[in-house]
């Protein structure tokens, strides 16, 4: 959580500092994005198919954690719902 907070703070500083120098907002935001990130690359990332989870599958693989934040495991959600009934 701390990492996400500092990333957010640094992005806000990276956007607001150039604005105080008289630059436009679009230019400040574009300065945060890598040059090789094109609309075609973004489209291919967004349209990539995601595997469907089968909760009863014994060979279900746990998703990889990204940025030290792991998504909740699907079968834990189901177990929590059963306990709350």
Swiss-Prot record:
Acts as an agonist of neurotensin receptors. It binds to human neurotensin type 1 receptor (NTSR1), rat neurotensin types 1 and 2 receptors (NTSR1/NTSR2) and mouse neurotensin type 3 receptor (SORT1). GO terms for molecular function: toxin activity. Residues 23-60, 76-85 form a propeptide. It is found in: Secreted. Residues 1-22 form the signal peptide. Expressed by the venom duct. Belongs to the conotoxin C superfamily. This is Contulakin-Lt1. The cysteine framework is C-C. Disulfide bonds join 65-70. Keywords: Cleavage on pair of basic residues, Disulfide bond, G-protein coupled receptor impairing toxin, Neurotoxin, Secreted, Signal, Toxin.
């Amino acid at each position: 959580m701390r990492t996400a907070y500092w990333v957010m703070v640094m992005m806000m500083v990276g956007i607001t500092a150039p604005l105080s120098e008289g630059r436009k907002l679009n230019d400040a935001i574009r300065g945060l994005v890598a040059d090789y990130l094109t609309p075609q690359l973004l489209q291919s990332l967004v349209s990539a198919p995601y595997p469907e989870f089968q909760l009863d599958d014994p060979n279900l693989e746990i998703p990889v954690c990204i940025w030290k934040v792991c998504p909740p495991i699907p079968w834990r959600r189901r177990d929590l719902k059963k306990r709350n009934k």
